[in-house]
């Protein structure tokens, strides 16, 4: 199934079907604004083109056997951007998911939302919740959209919930462990990311899944998100397959 992922132009080898494909891939979608600026276009055009890449990469990841694809689409820090840009970005998931719902269903994709969703505009939350509900029975790849998400706030939120249980007398402070924190994160039902991909040449996490990526493999590329191709995705998977994950061992 995976041997169709060949870059016939430059001879790139296919993903190795005999080597582990990452179960959970997380991507920081970066470079939409720069993509548009390089072409003398408004930033919103870049964001719209970036949505097309989401369709392409979700389809590729699904066919490769990736189980969870988490996309960092809007962070808790992105609210400081111009209001017109924020409004446009938060309309995109609504338009994308509504138009793509038949394809998502046909490809057995399950959509999930991660983040402080109650702070999102009602129209955004309603649209994503609807698609999540209608795809809940699908058992193909999970498309996990991080909207209004921040890694630090995720940890703080989990810590507060654990503290509430201590106050209620459910357990003592000395009983708190990593598993308890993990059980109260937005990702409590998901495996930690095996591979993080970040586009646009930036070399930082930008407050994304800080707890969950303790042992994730990182892969950075200068390619801007709207230009990110299936071949680029294959390259990231190939690099991952060649690495040895030690988890602190030797």
Per-range role (PLM):
Residues 1-250:
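Flexible, compositionally biased loop and terminal segments
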């Amino acid at each position: 199934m995976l041997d169709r992922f060949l870059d016939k132009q430059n001879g790139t080898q296919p993903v190795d079907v005999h080597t582990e494909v990452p179960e959970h891939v997380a991507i920081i979608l970066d470079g939409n604004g720069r993509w548009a600026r390089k072409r003398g276009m408004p930033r919103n055009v870049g964001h719209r083109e970036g949505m097309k890449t989401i369709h392409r990469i979700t389809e590729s990841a699904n066919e490769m056997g990736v189980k969870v694809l988490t996309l960092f689409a809007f962070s808790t820090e992105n609210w400081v951007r111009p209001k017109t840009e924020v409004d446009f970005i938060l309309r995109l998931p609504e338009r994308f998911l509504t138009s793509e719902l038949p394809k998502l269903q046909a490809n057995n994709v399950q959509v999930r939302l991660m983040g402080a969703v109650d702070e999102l505009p009602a129209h955004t939350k309603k649209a994503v919740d609807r698609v999540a509900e209608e795809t809940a029975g699908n058992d193909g790849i999970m498309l996990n959209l991080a909207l209004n998400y921040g890694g630090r706030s995720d940890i703080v939120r989990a810590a507060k919930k654990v503290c509430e249980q201590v106050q209620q007398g459910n357990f003592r402070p000395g009983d708190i462990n990593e598993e308890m924190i993990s059980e109260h994160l937005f990702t409590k039902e998901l495996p930690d990311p095996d591979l993080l991909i970040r586009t646009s040449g930036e070399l930082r996490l930008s407050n994304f899944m800080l707890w969950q990526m303790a042992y994730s493999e990182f892969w950075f590329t200068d390619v801007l998100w709207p230009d990110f191709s299936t071949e680029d995705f294959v390259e990231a998977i190939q690099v991952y397959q060649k690495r040895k994950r030690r988890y602190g061992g030797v």
